[in-house]
Structures are given as C-alpha cells and as structure tokens.
Amino acid sequence: MPIVKAKPTSPGRRFVEKVVHPHLYKGRPHAPLVEAQGRSGGRNNNGRITSRHIGGGHKQHYRIIDFKRTKDNIPATVERIEYDPNRTAHIALLKYADGERRYIIAPKKLKVGDTVLSGEASPIRPGNCLPLKNIPVGTTISNIELKIGKGAQMARSAGASVQLLGKEGIYAILRLRSGETRRVHVNCRAVIGEVSNTENNLKSLGKAGASRWRGVRPTVRGTAMNPVDHPHGGGEGRTMGKHPTTPWGQKTKGLKTRSNKRTDSMIIRRRRAKKK
C-alpha cells in the first residue's frame, strides 16, 4: 500500500505519514460481533495508577475475534476486510456456508471473495487454519496457539509471522521474528501466512495529539522529575549519579525479569542469546 505525506500546512501535518488502504470497508462493523469496551485510565480497582502513560483517547467498541478457529470443514467466504482500532492488524469478516459470521485476524494477501477453511484437511493457503502437525516444514505461519484449544496467542500483530523449522515427536520447532526458537505442541493450531498491514511500522503519527487520540499519555523522563517522584530526579544540572532504575528502584537496562520457569523447557534458543 502507498505511503502518503500531507502538505506541510501546519507542524503536525508536516511530519505525518499515513499508509493508505483503499481495500478496507468504510461502513460500520457487524453489530452482533461488537460489544462495549470501557477504559481504565491505567487505574486498578483502588483508583491507583498501575500502568503509566494511559488515559483519554477516542471511544472504541471491541470486535469479537475468533482466535480458536474451531468451525472445522465448513467453508467461509471473506465478505470484507475492516479496520480494527483495538489492534494493528486488519480483520476479516467471514460468512460461513451455514450463514454464521465471524471476525478473524486478516492474513496478508487475503481478499474479499476468497474462501478460507479450518481443519486438518485444509489446503495450505493464506487464512486457512490447521494443526501444526498438518503444516509442511518451512511454512510461514501466524496466530499460533501455545495451549491446545486455548486460541491464538502468538504472532497476532501487524506483519507478524513465525517459521515452522521442524517437528520432533509431539513438538513442533518454531523460529520467531525476535530470533527465539521454541517448542509448541503439534496439536496446537496456526494460520497460514503472515499477518496483514505489514507497512504499519512505516507510518508516522506526526504530532503528539495523534497519540492522545489512541489513549497514550506523555512519558516524562525521570531526570526531569523531583527526587520525591523518581530515583533519577533532583540534583543540580543534568546529573543522575547511579545506575538507571525504574520509578520503583528496580534496575533497568539488562536486568532479567522473566519468572515463568514452567515454560523454560519449551524455549530452545532465547531471543537475547549471544551469537557464537
């Protein structure tokens, strides 16, 4: 899709770069698959900030996405490709042969009028969903389950993809974009092809207000704060005098924080592993 730059009629317009998607549906989403979505403003049930830099933003409705793809052996036709404000990828509205409609994450090259299928006997085409044991080695996949039947958890954002490297017994070997190599059970499902909207990383919002529309508040540097607000705060001039830390005093820039030992055995090569 082409990247369009606006005429510099204002400082905000000067730096904005948009990706144009003329194939996207311009109407309202399918009403039965839409539900209300509130905003927390980054606060918990006590009203305290638990996630910084969150607040405001345009009101949004949540589109109910079918991440499990368990409607097997029933062909579905792509009615339209839509924008979804809740994610970077585009979504596709499917109409199954029995009349039911569902949203899925749209893979790259999926077009209106295409037919998609789920199940073990599905052909290897973009948008089809089948277990890893039925996918040929070397295939590019996305929307991958980590637990059987739980639904897609991995490679769901715009342009994301994973390569199937091989199969060993009950596990498939996957290589992620980050460089990590890990095992996933062969009965877990995945979708053929990479996720749509691959040019998403090329766009430029152009101004701070565009981030505010998305519900993102400003990020203030710790060195610009007072000592009461951040460990980096205070001092005469630009001084910090200590190792970089989070606002709560935990060391940053390299401190390992992963604590999920239960799945350590599934990771063959870590994304931060040093190259030999």
Curated annotation (Swiss-Prot):
Entry-linked InterPro entries: NA-bd_OB-fold, Rib_uL2_dom2, Ribosomal_uL2, Ribosomal_uL2_bac/org-type, Ribosomal_uL2_C, Ribosomal_uL2_CS, Ribosomal_uL2_dom3, Ribosomal_uL2_RNA-bd_dom
Keyword rRNA-binding: yes
Keyword field: Ribonucleoprotein, Ribosomal protein, RNA-binding, rRNA-binding
GO CC terms in record: large ribosomal subunit
A Pfam cross-reference name: Ribosomal_L2_C
Matches recorded under SUPFAM superfamilies: Nucleic acid-binding proteins, Translation proteins SH3-like domain
Gene3D superfamilies with a match to the protein in the record: 2.30.30.30, Nucleic acid-binding proteins, Ribosomal protein L2, domain 3
Signal peptide: none
Region (Disordered): 33-55, 221-276
Quaternary structure and interacting proteins, as annotated: Part of the 50S ribosomal subunit. Forms a bridge to the 30S subunit in the 70S ribosome.
Role summary: One of the primary rRNA binding proteins. Required for association of the 30S and 50S subunits to form the 70S ribosome, for tRNA binding and peptide bond formation. It has been suggested to have peptidyltransferase activity; this is somewhat controversial. Makes several contacts with the 16S rRNA in the 70S ribosome.
Protein name: Large ribosomal subunit protein uL2
Lineage: Bacteria, Pseudomonadati, Pseudomonadota, Gammaproteobacteria, Moraxellales
Gene (UniProt): rplB
